[in-house]
Amino acid sequence: MSESLVVCDVAEDLVEKLRKFRFRKETHNAAIIMKIDKDKRLVVLDEELEGVSPDELKDELPERQPRFIVYSYKYQHDDGRVSYPLCFIFSSPLGCKPEQQMMYAGSKNKLVQTAELTKVFEIRNTEDLTEEWLREKLGFFH
């Protein structure tokens, strides 16, 4: 393998936005979608969404380009309790350019550590991002 693994830094304004997002008080679903600026080698904000379901979020993701998502999800437990887990979702669709995938894969752990997240999931097809999929993944934590 001739290419070395590139680990991109996280843009300072994005670090602050993630910190604020972590402590938000709103009770609806919300997402921060991030991408890599390959020229600057930085993880930057792509889009911020409020009141978005997993199915609506899926429609915002490019089908052929990787993205990082931090998603605040209103999780209704079977016993009636409600929690708001923060999920990190790495969307790495099949058919992405290999160098792009390597750059995202190499930067994922640094971003997860920066955002201090523990619920980390990956999808290889944007169509997989559904409410059912997310509830199943979160079921392991609750």
From Swiss-Prot:
It comes from the Eukaryota. One of its GO terms (biological process) is actin filament debranching. GO terms for molecular function: actin binding; Arp2/3 complex binding; growth factor activity. One of its GO terms (cellular component) is cortical actin cytoskeleton. Phosphorylated; stimulated by phorbol ester. Keywords: Acetylation, Growth factor, Phosphoprotein. InterPro entries: ADF-H, ADF-H/Gelsolin-like_dom_sf, GMF. Residues 4-139 form the ADF-H domain. The modification N-acetylserine is found at S2. This protein causes differentiation of brain cells, stimulation of neural regeneration, and inhibition of proliferation of tumor cells. Belongs to the actin-binding proteins ADF family. GMF subfamily. PANTHER family: GLIA MATURATION FACTOR BETA, GLIAL FACTOR NATURATION FACTOR. This is Glia maturation factor beta. The gene is Gmfb.
